Structures are given as structure tokens and as C-alpha cells.
Amino acid sequence: MKKFNLRNLSIAFLTIAFLGFQSCSKDGMSGDGETLSQAELQTILNTDDIAGAVDTALAEIIGGNSDESVTVGKEGECYSAEYTETGFVATFNNCVLNGTDNINGTVTATYEVGSEMTTFTATYQDFYVGNIKVNGTRTFEISSSTEQTSVSFSIISDMSIEMEDGSVISENGTKTFTIAFGDSLEGTMISISGSWNVEADGSVYAVETLEDLQGSAACEHMTTGTMVVSKNGLAVTVDFGNGECDDVATLIYPNGATEEISL
């Protein structure tokens, strides 16, 4: 099996967590009784929390690297794999991720390595993270600048997640993560863009970035950019701020009402 370095892929998945925030919302902000609740926002963002940990572990296997943040047993102890020139099929048996969740199940990985672009597709089949079951595909298109000063990851998802209580969340769409490396952590910038749909509890949420969500790697949250979350005809804009390294964002409802939230 041809091996290539996907360590930067792990960094990209860490940026996903920057989108997670806690809402201090109040009912009635939209003027017609329709709002976007904290629970709904958590549902929209929850798919990346689950799939990201698994993807990071796969990146470690493919790259042949080690990372203290991810603990994966050696082949034969934790997983078995059959390799080809273009990928592998791996079956996991109680592998430990980040010291918490056991992963079990099968993933089929195929990839194509180019001089400037690497395409990697992971297909999950009854893949468990703890008691949460993942099915579907995630395709990663990974590129870097010729000067190696930045790296970009486009993630195309078509997947379903069955929670421990039996509820199902599905997601499809594309997200792009870009990391521009600086001389320091403060000077390294992370950008997120894309559009995707999430279906849960009978509702469909359409998410689209209007202005790329950006922030310094030294900040805990994204600090600029806007995205729109649409549900049942209600479109709420989330504004991440003016560049200050804080934990504040603003919800903007169609009638002009605004609401400040803590990230």
C-alpha cells in the first residue's frame, strides 16, 4: 500500500470544534414564534463531532504516524486490515479513541495521490463510536500550496448517524477547511466555508456560509464570518464577529431582531 502523510488532516478536524457553541437564546426573537434553539444548533454540528474522531484515527493509520491525542492499538491487537495499491478495508475491534469511546465496525478506504491533490474516500458500514452507529461516505480532497504555506481540505459527506436513543441524524453536503500557516500560532489562520443539509427529528436544516468563517489558531472560536441556518422557512444568520478573539456571536433574525450568544 502506498503511504502518504495525512497529519494535517488531523489539524483540519480540530477546526470543526470551533463551530460548536452554546446558545443563550430566548423565545420569540423571530417575531412569529419560530426560533433556532440551542438543541437544534447542537444537532446541526454534532455529526462532525462524531465523524471527526473516526476520520482522525484513519488518518493516523494511512499516514503511519503516531499522535498522542489519538490512541489506536497496533494492527492485530485493535484492528485488522486488507491492503491494496489504492486503499484498504479495515475492521476495528474495541479501538480506543481519545481515551473515551471504543470504535467497532468496518471502513473501506480508497485514495488517489497526485502531485498537488490527494483524494481519499472512507465508506463506513455499521461503524460504531461508542454506542453511536455511523453509515455512509465521506470524501476528502486535500491540496496544498506549492510553497507549503497553506493546506486545504474539502469534505463531501453523505452519511447517517444513529444515536444511542435510536434517533437518526443525516448529513450531506460539502465543507472546506483551509489552514494558512504563519510564523506563530497567532499568525496561523483557519477558514471554513461550504453548504450542507442536516435532517433530524423530522426537520431539515440547510446551512450555508455567506462569508468564510475565520479565526486565528490561537483563538478558541471563529472570530469573523457569517453563516445562514434555514429551517421551515426561517433563515437565521450567525455572525461570528469583527476579528476579536472572544466567545461572542450574534444571531440575526429575518425581522431584524438580533441576539448575542456565547460560543
Residue ranges and their predicted role:
Residues K2-I11:
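Bacterial N-terminal signal peptides that target proteins for export
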Residues L14-T15:
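Hydrophobic alpha-helical targeting segments used for export or membrane insertion
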Residues L19-S23:
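C-terminal motif of bacterial Sec signal peptides marking the signal peptidase cleavage site
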